[in-house]
Amino acid sequence: MRVPEPLGLKIYRTLSRAAEPVANFALRHRLQKGKEDPDRIDERRGIAKRPRPNGTLIWIHGASVGESLSVIPLVQRLRERRPDVNFLVTTGTVTSANLMAERLPEGAFHQYVPLDHPDFVSSFLDYWRPDAGIFVESEFWPNLILGARQKVPKMTLVNGRVSPGSFEDWKRQPNSIKFILSSFDAIIAQDYKNAERLTTLSGGVVGMFGNLKNAAPPLPADDNEVARLKEKIGDRPFWLAASTHPGEEEIALNTHQILRQDYPEILTIIAPRHPGRGAEICALADERSMQFAQRSVNGELTPETELYIADTLGELGIFYRLSDIAFVGGGITPKGGHNPLEPARLGAAILHGPHTFNFVETYNDMRAAGGAALVRNERELATAIRRLWHDAKTRETMIDAARGAAESNVDKILNDICDALLEKAPNKAGS
């Protein structure tokens, strides 16, 4: 039995309806900042230019690049199983839209998700009339979900995730989150911890088939650029600190200085989580009188370069292919960690900090397989890197274990999720 809509949600929806001028101002501001596509800005208001395809249409929503990467193999597998069905994929960022344009299979197409305004959402849903909706991970915009609840016959939350911080926030609004989650006919969590949190918040049954991100395709890379940089690096010992946050770059630079005592030709590559922080990392290197090159301003990697700052968007796949040792950030600073499957599938041994609540079971499985090691500070990080450089057999064993853990059960995860979803996908001959 569905619970009545809480007063707090009613107030939110009423205020958001009155805030259309604010929503339009926000869109204009984002457009000026380059965060919206000027040719497709109306999609953010729920206004489409392309026609709705005939027949069954399944809507899949993934907010950003990370969720988009998870969506691609899911859509591919669903299309294999149901070639008669079309798929509408929505995301909210320009980067993810570009990714969708490159990788979505035939029978699937992309639209920007409307802003969380009742009229924009209603316009979107009335135009596309999806026969089923699939939300990936944890974007719980009330107007979007509650609007879909009224107009989409079947709704499923897939790869559901609630961070510890969000869990504590939602526990202070139990009726609101329970009402939102009751919009879904089925909830499938990405791991046991998230299944427990979603069960607590929803008060219902939550399934768990494994993390859909395990099935995401490897990050793309320009093979010519990989070869060029590999030639530039030559035989120098080097390592990668990827997806780093403030505080972790200092640890990476301190690690570099520790290792330089034994490896004077060492090269450290830092790829910050947010590329716009490149200048900030340059300043840290300046403070240490380090020779550095900044990729975003075409800084050239030379034999004298001690630090290479990879502060460009969408190129992490290049550096994961280059380096066989990857420290994955977000775990020494308490950000919850980032996806270790990406470097593992591209041939890197994984080092990470203790705060990995976004990927708890993934890291646990990878450590249990011998593909990852936990480090808490620069001393432990330097020790781990030194050990892997010193012992090639240990390094190769760790790389193979990381790759094996990342690739295990991919087919099972996809098939289990597709089985659950296609039970809810109606057959329909016409539009």
Language model region names:
Residues R2-R40:
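A transmembrane-helix-recognition feature enriched in membrane-embedded lipid enzymes
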Residues N24-D223, T244-P246, L259-I266, R273-H274, ...:
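Active-site and donor-binding regions of nucleotide-sugar-utilizing enzymes
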Residues M100, L104-Y112, C282-A310:
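Nucleotide-activated donor-binding/catalytic signature segment of Leloir-type glycosyltransferases, i.e.
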Residues F124-D126, I180, K232, L301, ...:
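Structural alpha-helical scaffold elements that stabilize or flank donor/cofactor-binding regions
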Residues W128-A132, T305-K335:
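Acidic donor-binding loop of glycosyltransferase active sites
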Residues F184, T200, R321-A405:
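Catalytic binding pocket for nucleotide-activated donors in carbohydrate/polymer assembly enzymes
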Residues L240-E250, H256-Q257, I266-R288:
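Anionic-ligand-binding alpha/beta catalytic cores of soluble enzymes and soluble regulatory domains
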Residues S408-S431:
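C-terminal alpha-helical cap of glycosyltransferases
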